[in-house]
Curated annotation (Swiss-Prot):
A Gly-transPro motif from one monomer fits into the active site of the other monomer to allow specific chiral rejection of most L-amino acids except L-Ala. The trans conformation of the motif is maintained by Arg-150. It is found in: Cytoplasm. Belongs to the DTD family. It comes from Gallus gallus. A motif (Gly-transPro motif, allows the protein to recognize chirality of D-amino acids) lies at residues 159-160. GO terms for molecular function: Ala-tRNA(Thr) deacylase activity; D-tyrosyl-tRNA(Tyr) deacylase activity; tRNA binding. This is D-aminoacyl-tRNA deacylase 2.
Amino acid sequence: MAAARPVLARALLQQCLFARLQVKPPEHGAEAEWEEIQRGLVIYICFFKGADEDLVPKIVNVLLNVKLSEDENGEYVSVLDLPGNVLIIPQATLGGKLKGRKMQYHTNIEKEKGMELYSQFVSLCEKELAANPKCMEAGVLVKHGTYGNRQVLKLDTNGPYTHLVEF
């Protein structure tokens, strides 16, 4: 029996009607900063040790083209065909493994490399939506969180449509 190939990235996909992510907390009298989207897809992403730049296009292709959303006819379509907005959230906790009663994150990628891959992932998602005629016409957007920061999320979802995808 062949050895299982290691997981290099994990993404959690969640449909939304509205999502709002705090990317900067309030400080020194300044208001908090938020990113928000209307109907679309929230993508939580985590990279593991061994992940590299070659993996990013595959992840983007799969996640933006998977048919998870219902259109007005009840047909399942991708976020590109909907067309819908995308909110990307870096989520290192997706790399956790339960050991006893604690979570461990030994397989997560190093912070600097993870930040680099996350930036490439966001950029490629932006390019894919910008190159899609339906998305361009509808004016849909890619918004994203800040890598390495704690962030507050408010989410309105249209069902328990949460999917875990490993690469």
